[in-house]
Amino acid sequence: MGGSHIHSPQLDALRVALEEPLDRVQRHPVYAAVTTVEDLRAFMEHHVWAVWDFMNLVKAIQQRYTAISIPWTPRGDATVRRFVNEIVLEEESDEHPVGHGFCSHFELYVGSMAEVHARTDHVSRFVANLAEGLGFEAALALSDCQPAVANFLATTWDAAMAADEELLAAFAFGRETVIPVMFDRILTEAGALGNAGLLRHYLVRHVQLDGDSHSEMAKYLLTVACGDDPLRWARAGVSARRCLEARARLWDAVGDMVGAR
C-alpha cells in the first residue's frame, strides 16, 4: 500500500461521522498531564492493558484473513496476507531495542514499566491465568483492574468476536488511526519520559509503524469488507465509535488520577 490514501464515499462519510470521538481521544488532556514519574506510572499501569489487548484484534484478523490451520491452502488476497503477517511479525516478535533478540511489544512495554517501577503484577497475573487456560471473562473478573480498563478490554473483546466489518473498524479507527497521534502527543507533551528509554522506543516505534502503511491498509481492509453494503458500514461505525468512547473513558480515568483538566 505504501503511503497511498484510501478513498471511498462510505469511508469518507465514516471519517466525518467519527470526527467527534476521534477528536476527543486525540486531543485528550491526559497526555500533557503526565508530568511526574508518579503520573507516568499511573498512565502505564492503565495503558499496559490496551497494549495487551491490541493483540486480540491482530490475532482475530490473522485468523480470518490468513491460513493458520492444516492442511494448508492459500487463503484470500496475497497483499492482505502480507499486511496481516507483517503486523503479527512486528507486534509479536519485533527486534528488542537493546540487543536482546526479539520480543513482543507487550513484553517490551512490561519491561519499560520496570524502568519507572510501575506495577505489573495485576496484568502479569491476568496473562498467566490466560496461559493456564482460564477464559477471558473469568480472568478479567479476577484481574483487579480498574473499571475503565475492564470496560476497554470488554469492548475490544466484543469487537474481536463480531463480524468482519466490526472487527476491522475497531482496528482501523480504534487503533491504527489514533495511535500515531496519541503517542506523538505523549512524546512531545508528557514531561516524565526522561528515564523511560524503553517506553520512548515503544512510542516512537508505533508512530513509525502505525503512521505509515498500517493505518491505510487497515482502512483498505475495512472498505473491502463493507463494500457497498450500508448495513455493514453502519455496523462498522457503531463498532468504531464504541472503541473510541472506551478509549476516551480509559484516558478520563487516568486523567482523574494525574489531575488532567
Segments and roles (model prediction):
Residues G2-R261:
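Non-heme di-metal
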